[in-house]
């Protein structure tokens, strides 16, 4: 049974030194439950880049996939914005 609602995230590539793998930083704004102040929360995930089209600084869209390796559970969908 295929799951249709896969998670999609948009982030910035911070590393492309591994072969067919990129590290994407996801930045989100979350509100503190008590102080009601917005905080910037970031996390880094490894994503599979089969054709090695993305470079450091690019804005990319990634999608959740089956585990590819110990750390990779995301795959590159498209490069939204190239670094100039």
From Swiss-Prot:
One of the primary rRNA binding proteins, it binds specifically to the 5'-end of 16S ribosomal RNA. HAMAP family: Ribosomal_uS17_B. It comes from the Bacteria. The keyword rRNA-binding applies. Pfam families: Ribosomal_S17. One of its GO terms (molecular function) is rRNA binding. Belongs to the universal ribosomal protein uS17 family. GO terms for biological process: translation. Part of the 30S ribosomal subunit. Keywords: Ribonucleoprotein, Ribosomal protein, RNA-binding, rRNA-binding. PANTHER family: 40S RIBOSOMAL PROTEIN S11 FAMILY MEMBER, SMALL RIBOSOMAL SUBUNIT PROTEIN US17M. InterPro entries: NA-bd_OB-fold, Ribosomal_uS17, Ribosomal_uS17_bact/chlr, Ribosomal_uS17_CS. This is Small ribosomal subunit protein uS17. GO terms for cellular component: cytosolic small ribosomal subunit. The keyword RNA-binding applies. It comes from Borreliella burgdorferi (strain ATCC 35210 / DSM 4680 / CIP 102532 / B31) (Borrelia burgdorferi).
